[in-house]
Swiss-Prot record:
Succinyl-CoA synthetase functions in the citric acid cycle (TCA), coupling the hydrolysis of succinyl-CoA to the synthesis of either ATP or GTP and thus represents the only step of substrate-level phosphorylation in the TCA. The beta subunit provides nucleotide specificity of the enzyme and binds the substrate succinate, while the binding sites for coenzyme A and phosphate are found in the alpha subunit. This is Succinate--CoA ligase [ADP-forming] subunit beta. It comes from the Bacteria. It holds the Pfam family ATP-grasp_2. Mg(2+) binds at residues 197, 211. It comes from Solibacter usitatus (strain Ellin6076). PROSITE patterns: ATP_GRASP, SUCCINYL_COA_LIG_3. Substrate binds at residues 262, 319-321. GO terms for cellular component: cytosol; succinate-CoA ligase complex. Pathway: Carbohydrate metabolism; tricarboxylic acid cycle; succinate from succinyl-CoA (ligase route): step 1/1. Residues 9-242 form the ATP-grasp domain. Keywords: ATP-binding, Ligase, Magnesium, Metal-binding, Nucleotide-binding, Tricarboxylic acid cycle. One of its GO terms (biological process) is succinyl-CoA metabolic process. It catalyses: succinate + ATP + CoA = succinyl-CoA + ADP + phosphate; GTP + succinate + CoA = succinyl-CoA + GDP + phosphate.
Length: 384
């Protein structure tokens, strides 16, 4: 689960990471009031779940409250397009009005899971204020790493990183404290990503999290009811939100071949084979091993709500989800939803013959794939 910058900063502040003074604004009047409260020049920052906001025109500096009001009028309600939003962009519905700070240097701090080690890794770099992926690709030597152990970064690791990215001796303790606090927040909140970019050093030697991003492990949210309340459904794809209500794992993609599969591994393999056959998947949809006919019907309804879908591939290996259960749900969906796109079905496993018989006797013109490759070729041809 993603949250907004201002929400991430509020969490970091609870763990004693220094953040600039700021206020969230939902209206133009809120923005003006916030700017007056802060006094002096302020930064007006669009709040969406995507990076690259500055380059897209979503971050502007105002010299006073009057200019902040004018900027708020322009940014609130705009569709902000960045390299992470795609061409459709995101509607800006809230702003962060924040004090400006005298920046001496921009640095980077971040924590992600190292899948090779199976442990979180703390990264720090002197190249802050830019995409860390670009830094990693072009100048990987600028990224320093320390493996994390519970409950967080040790004092010697924090100081090592602080000195390593060129923090002056007078500011090392403050920077190390912020790093340690960030690592503790990561552990305590069951985060999958915690990032401060840029982490700044001011002209008077202080450090601040000038921007912050935290992503949480969805599977751990049951332990953090307070985090669930931070979820902004307006920032999520409506179909993905609807799928989550029915216990379905759905991610919308840009292709034309709709996919319904049981099991994440088989779902990814299905998308791969569709690409290999010359097509493009419209979604990732894992109905899970324990799905019933009603869930299958809901999955179909969600899948077909995407009007870019020109054909559907159902790829099921019957285990806990028996093939006859899947077929019953598919037929029910076809009857209730007035399906107009061609459907290719490939089933193997428990009760496969019964499942095929249900499809055969349904009266609908389902295309049967002999195997995955045959099914992929057929569905790509039908979607063309």
């Amino acid at each position: 689960m993603k949250i907004h910058e201002y929400q991430a900063k509020a969490i970091l502040a609870q763990y004693k990471v220094p953040v600039p003074r700021g206020h969230v604004a939902y209206t133009e009047a809120d923005a003006e009031t916030a700017a007056k409260t802060l006094g002096g020049s302020v930064v007006v920052k669009a709040q969406i779940h995507a990076g690259g906001r500055g380059k897209g025109g979503g971050v502007k500096v105002a010299k006073d409250a009057a200019e902040a009001l004018e900027l708020a009028k322009k940014i609130l309600g705009m569709t902000l397009v960045t390299h992470q939003t795609g061409p459709e962009g995101r509607l800006v519905q809230r702003l962060l009005i924040e004090e400006t700070l005298p920046i001496e240097r921009e640095l980077y701090l971040g924590i992600v899971l190292d899948r090779v080690q199976g442990k979180p890794v703390f990264m720090a770099s002197s190249a802050g204020g830019m995409d860390i992926e670009e830094v990693a690709a072009k100048t990987p030597e600028l990224i320093l790493k320390e493996t994390l152990e519970y409950p967080g970064l040790s004092p010697y690791q924090a100081r090592k990183l602080a000195f390593g990215i060129g923090i002056p001796a007078a500011s090392v303790n403050a920077a190390a404290a912020a790093m340690t606090a960030l690592s503790k927040a990561y552990w305590a909140m069951d985060a999958s990503l915690a990032e401060i970019n840029p982490f700044i050093l001011t002209t008077d030697g202080k450090v601040y999290a000038l921007d912050a991003k935290i992503t949480f492990d969805d599977n751990a949210l049951y332990r953090h009811k307070e985090l669930v309340e931070l979820r902004d459904l307006n920032e999520e794809d409506p179909l993905e939100v609807e799928a989550s209500k029915h216990g379905l794992n759905y991610i919308k993609l840009d292709g034309t071949v709709g996919c319904m599969v049981n099991g994440a591994g088989l779902a990814m393999a299905t998308m791969d084979i569709i690409k290999f056959a010359g097509g493009s998947p419209a979604n990732f949809l894992d109905v899970g091993g324990g799905a019933n006919a009603e869930q299958v019907k809901n999955a179909f309804r969600i899948l077909l709500s995407d009007h870019s879908v020109k054909a559907v591939l159902i790829n099921i290996f019957g285990g806990i989800l028996r093939c006859d259960t899947l077929a019953t749900g598919v037929v029910a969906a076809a009857r209730d939803l007035n399906i107009q796109v061609p459907i290719v079905v490939r089933m193997e496993g428990t009760n496969v013959e019964a499942g095929r018989q249900i499809l055969l006797e349904s009266g609908f013109n389902f295309t049967v794939g002999a195997d995955m490759w045959d099914a992929a070729q057929k569905v790509v041809k039908l979607a063309a």
